[in-house]
């Protein structure tokens, strides 16, 4: 523990690097592991020390750092033999070199990624060739070496290599880095072709962004092949000469420009390698130290990845210290090739996490080569709380591999992943309802956002399957989904009813719910601020309209006589008394109301306000902060006050309007504002305090 703490103190500052931008440890796939020697060089990121024997472990990292000699195949034995022949780049290639040097790549550092990808291609070609011929595989490795004194960076692979003719054609002609021709030859062998990264033939030329000149030494794996040197300063001419001491494979020496000498620094190159090429299939060494020892577990069969591996990989990609609440390891080849892992953090999201400015937390790879650390087009914005990795061979990229093209394919990929995540969360809710309820409590705001911001109704309804609410038909604390509500509906019922209130107590004692109880209709109780806006945007679910009980009271056309009034005649105002009282109230309230009506839907409440589309009006007032005065609100809302002629306050008001008109005015004003507050149409009740005090004084004067 002390050693781990020491490592954290020493290298903890490195944890601020971007997601998926730190290296890890692991075991080579195709060659024996050569442990690196002890080194007291530049600080290493904690993630870059992870070891496959104890995955992602800082202790394993320290053990690795203390063991064994360095391993490198890079030497300086090459020597040019005889004279060189000069060649001119094709016209298209000259133009490409200029584009690459000036504007193709947004970051110079990506030349390292491109050259590593090319080296991986060369090794994959060699592997395929030897396996098809039944030969044993040699050590298949990629090595990088930095030399700050000479201002160079070297990359060497032990791959298939190139002949003289291949050097001229592959490095002197656009779109012929070798991969395209190789794929043509293997067009009927999908397994081999699918692993070739370099599709565009321009990655090699990215070296000229930082190079004064580039030397390439290469020797083909074919028997009897000689070694050659290719040399160019990118000015439009290159030369090729025979060379001795060349090892099978390809070695590229980049002589850096004065303004690019940073790439002769081991620390700088390490950061770039761990950012982009941490999961290359072949062992990758920098100055003799193994770099890419972390497995790309998203490429593995899900059943072969243990819970512990997922926990450690989650901490790596999310740069977090908790455990994943949910894990989805998703692989498919239809309709698109997708290899992905998604995690939901166990920690409750902070306000920063909720912000739409945060953006995506999913990294995009193509055949284990990083394309984007925050792939904004791969998942819709509402799923930004999901951490993980997506790897797809079908994604169209521009020449620099850095920006996704807007295309139907990208939208299709986003749709596939969104649907799969929705299905996953739906399945989890059935598997463990209590765990899902905790998830929805923490992440429900994102789900609501998804419904509000999605245009397609079908997708809205898919996302709506994740919503959870309490219900009048279920005990307090028990949640239900819209699908479950629909399954309990009686035949012929077409509406799903809901009521927005701060809590269950207020919902159950709402005059609007009281009016619905007589109909014995299930009502969903929605407690969160944005529930109302969410359901207004959703509009319907499974061909059933979503109706607020407040709206239902306004649009329902059944007659009051449908309610059986069992109250004795003396307990209710007569029809004439009611008509006279309503006329007086219209005059007393003036422009604050549009009309006064009678209702027999209420039992315990004296009155309620009805407004067409109450929820939309309430949201409009809240968001726009309009209509601050009562008259302005009334003009916008056109509210109707519905009174209960059986309530003691209404009956007493009928008496006071003649005997004590001043007290009656105070009382009707208070009844009106109480109804407005209950409807959520008045946010600040403080202005009524003076009137309440007057009513209290009037009450005490009688004692």
UniProtKB/Swiss-Prot annotation:
Name one molecular function that GO assigns to this entry: ATP-dependent protein folding chaperone
Q: Does the keyword Phosphoprotein apply?
A: yes
Note the Gene3D superfamilies from the entry: 3.30.230.80, 3.40.50.11260, Heat shock protein 90, C-terminal domain, Histidine kinase-like ATPase, C-terminal domain
Q: Using the record's annotations, give every residue carrying the modification N6-acetyllysine.
A: 423, 430, 465
Entry-linked SMART domains: HATPase_c
Phosphothreonine: which positions carry it?
A: 173, 493
The UniProt record lists the keyword Phosphoprotein: yes
GO biological processes: negative regulation of cellular respiration; protein folding
Query: Where does this polypeptide localize?
Result: Mitochondrion; Mitochondrion inner membrane; Mitochondrion matrix
Chain segment of the transit peptide: 1-56
Residues that, per the record, bind ATP: 118, 157, 170, 204, 401
Q: Which GO terms describe its cellular component?
A: mitochondrial inner membrane; mitochondrial matrix
Q: What is its main location?
A: mitochondrion
Phosphoserine sites (modified residues): 169
Alphabetically list the UniProt keywords.
Acetylation, ATP-binding, Chaperone, Membrane, Mitochondrion, Mitochondrion inner membrane, Nucleotide-binding, Phosphoprotein, Transit peptide
Per the record, the similarity remark reads: Belongs to the heat shock protein 90 family.
- Name the job this protein performs: Chaperone that expresses an ATPase activity. Involved in maintaining mitochondrial function and polarization, downstream of PINK1 and mitochondrial complex I. Is a negative regulator of mitochondrial respiration able to modulate the balance between oxidative phosphorylation and aerobic glycolysis. The impact of TRAP1 on mitochondrial respiration is probably mediated by modulation of mitochondrial SRC and inhibition of SDHA.
Q: Which NCBIfam families match?
A: PRK05218.1 (NF003555)
Subunit notes for this chain?
Binds to the intracellular domain of tumor necrosis factor type 1 receptor. Binds to RB1. Interacts with SRC. Interacts with SDHA.
What's this protein's name? Answer: Heat shock protein 75 kDa, mitochondrial
The species this protein was found in: Bos taurus (Bovine)
């Amino acid at each position: 523990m002390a050693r781990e703490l020491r490592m954290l103190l020493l290298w903890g500052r490195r944890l601020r690097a971007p997601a998926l931008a730190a290296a890890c440890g692991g075991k080579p796939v195709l060659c024996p592991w050569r442990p690196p020697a002890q080194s007291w060089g530049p600080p290493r990121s904690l993630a870059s020390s992870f070891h496959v024997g104890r995955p992602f472990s800082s202790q394993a990292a320290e053990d690795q750092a203390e063991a064994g000699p360095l391993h490198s195949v890079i030497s300086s034995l090459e020597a040019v033999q005889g004279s060189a022949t000069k060649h001119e780049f094709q016209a298209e290639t000259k133009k490409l070199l200029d584009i690459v040097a000036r504007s193709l790549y947004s970051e110079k550092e990506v030349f390292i990624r491109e050259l590593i990808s090319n080296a991986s291609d060369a090794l994959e070609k060699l592997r395929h060739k030897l396996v098809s011929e039944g030969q044993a595989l040699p050590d298949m490795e990629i090595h990088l070496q930095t030399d700050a004194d000479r201002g160079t960076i070297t990359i060497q692979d032990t791959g298939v290599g190139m002949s003289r003719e291949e050097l001229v054609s592959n490095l002197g002609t656009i779109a012929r880095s070798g991969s395209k021709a190789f794929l043509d030859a293997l067009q009927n062998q999908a397994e081999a072709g699918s692993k070739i990264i370099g599709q565009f033939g321009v990655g090699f030329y990215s070296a000229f962004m930082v190079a004064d000149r580039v030397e390439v030494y290469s020797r083909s794996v074919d028997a009897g092949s000689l070694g050659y040197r290719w040399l160019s300063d990118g000015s439009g001419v290159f030369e090729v000469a025979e060379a001795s001491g060349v090892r099978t494979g390809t070695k590229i020496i980049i002589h850096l420009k004065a303004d690019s000498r940073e790439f002769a620094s081991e620390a700088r190159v390490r950061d770039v390698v761990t950012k982009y090429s941490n999961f290359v299939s072949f062992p990758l060494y920098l100055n003799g130290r193994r770099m890419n020892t972390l497995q790309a577990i998203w490429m593995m069969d899900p059943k072969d990845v243990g819970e512990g591996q997922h926990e450690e990989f989650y901490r790596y990609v999310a740069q977090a210290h908790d455990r994943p609440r949910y894990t989805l390891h998703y692989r498919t080849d239809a309709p698109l090739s997708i290899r992905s892992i998604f995690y939901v953090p166990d920690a409750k999201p902070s306000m920063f996490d909720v912000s739409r400015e945060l953006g995506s937390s999913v990294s995009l790879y193509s055949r284990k080569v990083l394309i984007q650390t925050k792939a904004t087009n791969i998942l819709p914005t509402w799923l930004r709380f999901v951490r993980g990795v997506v790897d797809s061979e079908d994604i169209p990229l521009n020449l620099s591999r850095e920006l996704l093209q807007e295309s139907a394919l990208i939208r299709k990929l986003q749709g596939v992943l969104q649907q799969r995540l929705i299905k996953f969360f739906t399945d989890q809710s059935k598997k463990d309802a209590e765990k899902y309820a905790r998830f929805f409590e923490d992440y429900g705001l994102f789900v609501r956002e998804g419904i509000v911001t999605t245009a397609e109704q079908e997708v809205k309804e898919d996302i709506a399957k994740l919503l959870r609410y309490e219900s009048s038909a279920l005990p307090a604390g028990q949640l239900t989904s819209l699908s479950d509500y629909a399954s309990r509906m009686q035949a012929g019922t077409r509406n799903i009813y809901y009521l927005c209130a701060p809590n269950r107590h207020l919902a159950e004692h709402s005059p609007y719910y009281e009016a619905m109880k007589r109909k014995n209709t299930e009502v969903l109780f929605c407690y969160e601020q944005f529930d109302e806006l969410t359901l207004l945007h959703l509009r319907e679910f499974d061909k059933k309209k979503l109706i607020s009980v407040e709206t239902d009271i306004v649009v329902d056309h059944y007659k009051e006589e449908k309610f059986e009034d069992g109250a004795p005649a003396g307990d209710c105002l007569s029809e004439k008394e009611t008509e006279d009282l309503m006329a007086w109230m219209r005059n007393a309230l003036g422009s604050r109301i549009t009309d006064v009506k009678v209702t027999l839907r209420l039992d315990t409440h004296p009155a309620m306000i009805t407004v067409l589309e109450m929820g939309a009006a309430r949201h409009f007032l809240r968001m726009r902060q309009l209509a601050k005065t009562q008259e302005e609100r009334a003009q916008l809302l056109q509210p109707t006050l519905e009174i209960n002629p059986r309530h003691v306050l209404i009956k007493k008001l009928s008496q006071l309007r003649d005997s004590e008109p001043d007290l009656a005015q105070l009382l009707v004003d208070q009844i009106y504002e109480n109804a407005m507050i209950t409807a959520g149409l008045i946010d600040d009740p403080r202005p009524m305090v003076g009137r309440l005090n007057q009513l209290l004084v009037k009450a005490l004067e009688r004692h």
